[in-house]
Amino acid sequence: MKEIMAVMLSLLACTVLLAGCNNFSESNEEQSLKVYSFSGENEYISVSNGVIILDGKEEICYGGDLKVMSDNFSDITTYSTTIYINGSEKETLLSNSVDDQTGETIDVSGNIGKISGDVLRDSDDKLTDNLWFELKTTNLSGEENTYRVQLKTTEITKEVKK
């Protein structure tokens, strides 16, 4: 019984010591966490549930969901989606392409995709009025079309203490 108590006290002491090994300087610093949601639509397409997360260390862009609202997309064989900032020059945040090589058609609606890393090269100030979505399609006849939607961006969170 004494051995069990000695082991329990040793484990408790180790736990207390290790709990103090947290990065103390970072716990007192203010960390910037910003979360933006975005969506937009026109008569042809709708983008919803998009999210951009910036925490000072990592940047993540979830493209959201694409929905077609027209019959123009029933014979698509190739398409690409791009989310970009339209400033002095076009800054691409996320881009995906799908190409069917079998001669069949592709459903354009669905998840746009996700990317993490250095998503925003400069600051996030440009997100509010300059975020755009672009869909380029090619149909069975080889006809190419481009659809653009300006995305309404809303900042959900601001500065938080960690």
Question: What role is predicted for each listed range?
Answer:
Residues M1-A19:
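Sec-dependent bacterial lipoprotein signal peptides
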Residues N22-F24:
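Bacterial signal peptide processing site
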Residues E29-V35:
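Immediate post-signal-peptide N-terminus of mature secreted/exported proteins
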Residues V35-S88:
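Short, surface-exposed binding/anchoring microloops in extracellular/periplasmic proteins
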Residues I52, S97-Q101, L151-T157:
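A short, sequence-level motif marking secondary-structure junctions
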Residues D65-M69, T82-Y84, D118, E134-T138, ...:
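Residue-level recognition of well-ordered beta-strand positions that form the cores
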Residues K90-N145:
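Short, solvent-exposed, Trp/other aromatic-anchored flexible loops in extracytoplasmic proteins
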Residues E143-K162:
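Short beta-strand elements
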